[in-house]
């Protein structure tokens, strides 16, 4: 019960001290505090499967054919509690899959359908995801039947793919392997708005300039997947909408042709729902009453008829045959002139002028009745925008090309955040390598690793050069969409070789030394770069009195320029790296927040972040050789000096400017060291200080080295999906 409840209801007779409501979060008192919880959201404790067999192991026993057969049957098995449009759930399942995958954004790789996140807040309650809770409940019998052998994430995206197959499309393929999460993804920033569908102005510097949308966002309003179907801020104007569509889809890594194909193919089947009063709907799933059992948007006027459903507020199908994948979208869009009308729910939509009765789709519940088709403002953009129109005309002239382009774009949409093909499972994985999958060839494994390490050690490279280069190669990894990382040695290719954060001159020098070593040994450069980092760490550990061997698994390959979509790699360029105490520019976001974001994308925990930063500082790996945070007189030795001096009360910390500090002797006032916010946060934040104190203890020097090596190896192997 609410301890602040002062109304007539009785108070709980037992003192209720559990912080069970979200508004009781203890950190709500300090909203600017670092949210370290984003580093631990995938803790195994909330996972009911515990340490049992992995999902990928369970997949091996899945009867794929039986599941697909059952899925086909489900699509036409209409249920009274949520009747199917036209007796077919295909449109609903496609929308579920689309909206699950469509939250992906290229900038940080977050969102997307790879984790089943649409089951949880906020996505399960976004206005744009209205009534998709019904689609998930329709899939429950299949999830119940096949159990641990199929994740929700896979099942949802498979449902959309099978729906297209059932309605006549030859799909490009399907990869299983998405693992479910068990709670909301609290690391993802969806926007600053505090209300659903707040005007776009909040997230744009200038709504008239779509490229001014706040990064990393990829949707025009809070609670939408892409654009407002009624137009910019709900005001129809196809050309303005076209500009927003272009930017929105580009932020999902889609070009104009893929965007036009997805728009047309997505609206070839299914319908919109707005035949009623949207104000009569119940609250979204997260706000619904207990007895609704997770059902949101309850419609008191449904009456068992699909044609009475209300979702987006728009009402009608796009094509004459909404359960067939055909060319009907283009035939209607380009075959008629269109005018603005309002749906029964009051939404702005486009309707054809003087349409022939035989071109009108039948009613979703009563096939004896015909209804007016509709187009959204985004559909009209395909006709009015010159570039989109030219693409659509190309599709109309070559239906086979359109269907293949759409099938490939759908595959990309539903697999974009899965990572390389090593992460795909099942009988329908396409054999074709696609450049957006960031392919990497298999690397050699039979070479003499010890010989390579000896050659590196004798090369004259410094510890800092070796460790920094290996780190820079691996730090691009993003667990969000499984891109980046050391495998492929793309650090030697454009654009990475020219990134400021990679110190191109230093990088070229190091690669010039390592490349002949790799060549002579028959090893990949990717492996040798990582080995060089390991050699540097082993040398530094010995200098501190610890004899360690850093684990290493050969087999990384070297990607080529032809395997690399250079433009799509631009988003992986680090703007800051707290591990190397570097920022490309002065940002509004603090250095410690950017460090936290990098850490989360790398899949590291707060203790791992702590030990890595402390170790990297004493190894002298700072960008440009700066001395910020190098709290040691033994640079190059893997000691705990960073933590010892950070926690020593003999020193005070004095700001020099907004970003840097001096560490001064309290008695003499003499400056001893300098630091950045990315250093001092480990003494300021109470949680991080607790970790720092562990490593500052006299008895934990050995633990520090062991923990550093383990965290380092985790980063170096983050993209080694072939080892799983």
Curated annotation (Swiss-Prot):
GO BP term, example: hydrogen peroxide catabolic process
This enzyme's EC code(s)? 1.11.1.21
Q: Locate the cross-link: Tryptophyl-tyrosyl-methioninium (Trp-Tyr) (with M-252).
A: 98-226
Under SUPFAM superfamilies, the record lists: Heme-dependent peroxidases
What are the coiled-coil residue ranges? none
PTM annotation, UniProt: Formation of the three residue Trp-Tyr-Met cross-link is important for the catalase, but not the peroxidase activity of the enzyme.
Q: Which UniProt keywords apply?
A: Heme, Hydrogen peroxide, Iron, Metal-binding, Oxidoreductase, Peroxidase
Top-level taxon of the source organism: Bacteria
Crosslink position(s): Tryptophyl-tyrosyl-methioninium (Tyr-Met) (with W-98):
226-252
A Gene Ontology cellular-component term = cytosol
Q: Where is this site: Transition state stabilizer?
A: 95
Any note on cofactor binding?
A: Binds 1 heme b (iron(II)-protoporphyrin IX) group per dimer.
Q: Which reaction does it catalyse?
A: H2O2 + AH2 = A + 2 H2O; 2 H2O2 = O2 + 2 H2O
Cofactor requirements of the protein: heme b
What residues form the catalytic site here? 99 (proton acceptor)
Please provide, alphabetically and separated by semicolons, the GO molecular function terms listed in this UniProt record.
catalase activity; heme binding; metal ion binding
Q: Return the similarity comment.
A: Belongs to the peroxidase family. Peroxidase/catalase subfamily.
What does this protein do, in the record's words? Bifunctional enzyme with both catalase and broad-spectrum peroxidase activity.
Subunit: Homodimer or homotetramer.
In its UniProt entry, what is this protein called? Answer: Catalase-peroxidase
């Amino acid at each position: 019960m609410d301890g602040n409840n002062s109304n007539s209801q009785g108070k709980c007779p037992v003192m209720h001290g559990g912080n069970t409501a979200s508004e009781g979060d203890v950190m709500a008192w300090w909203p600017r505090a670092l949210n370290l919880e984003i580093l631990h959201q995938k803790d195994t404790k909330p996972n009911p499967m515990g340490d049992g067999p992995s999902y990928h192991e369970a997949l091996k026993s899945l009867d794929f054919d039986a599941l697909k057969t059952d899925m086909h049957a489900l699509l036409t098995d209409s249920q009274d509690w949520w009747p199917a449009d036209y007796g077919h759930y295909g449109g609903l399942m496609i929308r579920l899959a689309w909206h699950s995958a469509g939250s992906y954004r290229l900038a940080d790789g977050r969102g997307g359908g790879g984790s089943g996140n649409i089951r949880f807040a906020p996505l399960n309650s976004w206005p744009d995801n209205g009534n998709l809770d019904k689609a998930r409940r329709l899939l429950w019998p299949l999830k119940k039947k096949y159990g641990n052998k199929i994740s929700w994430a896979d099942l949802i995206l498979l449902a959309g793919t099978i729906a297209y197959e059932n309605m006549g499309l030859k799909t490009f393929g399907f990869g299983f392997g998405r693992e479910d999460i068990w709670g909301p993804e609290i690391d993802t920033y969806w926007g600053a708005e505090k209300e659903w569908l707040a005007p776009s102005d909040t997230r744009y510097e200038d709504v008239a300039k779509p490229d001014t949308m706040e990064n990393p966002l990829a949707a025009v309003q809070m609670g939408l997947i892409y654009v407002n179907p009624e137009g910019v801020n709900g005001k129809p104007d196809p050309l303005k909408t076209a500009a927003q569509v272009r930017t929105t889809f580009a932020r999902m890594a889609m070009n104009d042709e893929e965007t036009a194909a997805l728009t047309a193919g997505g609206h070839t089947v299914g319908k919109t729902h707005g035949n009623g009063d949207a104000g009569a709907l119940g609250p979204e799933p997260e706000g619904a009453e207990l007895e609704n059992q997770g059902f949101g948007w309850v419609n008191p006027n449904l009456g068992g008829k699909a044609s009475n459903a209300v979702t987006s507020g728009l009402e009608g199908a796009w094509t004459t045959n909404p359960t067939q994948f055909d060319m009907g979208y283009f035939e209607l869009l380009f075959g008629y002139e269109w005018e603005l009308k309002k749906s029964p729910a009051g939404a702005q939509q486009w309707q054809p002028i003087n349409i022939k009765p035989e071109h009108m789709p039948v009613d979703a519940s009563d096939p004896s009745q015909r209804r007016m088709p509709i187009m959204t403002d985004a559909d009209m953009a395909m006709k009015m925008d010159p570039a989109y129109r030219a693409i659509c005309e190309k599709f109309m002239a070559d239906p086979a090309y359109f269907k293949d382009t759409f099938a490939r774009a759908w595959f990309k949409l539903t697999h974009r955040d899965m990572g390389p093909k090593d992460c795909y499972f099942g009988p329908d994985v396409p054999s074709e390598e696609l450049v957006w999958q960031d392919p990497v060839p298999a690397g050699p494994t039979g070479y003499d690793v010890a010989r390579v390490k000896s050659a590196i050690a004798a090369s004259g490279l410094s510890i800092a050069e070796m460790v920094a280069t290996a780190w820079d190669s691996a730090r691009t990894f993003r667990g969000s969409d499984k891109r980046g990382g050391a495998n492929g040695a793309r650090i030697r290719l454009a654009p990475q070789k020219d990134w400021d954060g990679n110190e191109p001159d230093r990088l070229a020098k190091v690669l010039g030394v390592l490349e002949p070593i790799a060549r002579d040994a028959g090893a990949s450069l990717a492996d040798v770069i990582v080995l060089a980092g390991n050699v540097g760490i082993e040398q530094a550990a010995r200098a501190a009195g610890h004899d360690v061997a850093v684990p290493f698994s050969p087999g990384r390959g070297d990607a080529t320029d032809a395997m690399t979509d250079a433009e799509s790699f631009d988003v992986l360029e680090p703007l800051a790296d707290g591990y190397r105490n570097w920022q490309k520019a002065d940002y509004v976001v603090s250095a410690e927040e950017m460090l936290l974001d990098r850490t989360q994308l790398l899949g590291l925990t707060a203790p791992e972040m702590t030990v890595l930063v402390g170790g990297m500082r004493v190894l002298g790996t700072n960008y440009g050789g700066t001395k910020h945070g190098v709290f040691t007189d033994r640079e190059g030795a893997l000691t705990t000096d960073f933590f010892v001096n950070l926690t020593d009360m003999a020193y005070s910390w004095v700001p020099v400017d907004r970003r840097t500090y001096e560490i001064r002797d309290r008695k003499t006032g003499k400056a001893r060291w300098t630091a950045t916010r990315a250093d001092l946060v480990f003494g300021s934040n109470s949680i991080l200080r607790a970790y720092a104190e562990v490593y500052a203890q006299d008895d934990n020097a050995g633990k520090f080295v062991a923990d550093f090596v383990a965290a380092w190896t985790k980063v170096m192997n983050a993209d080694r999906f072939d080892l799983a």
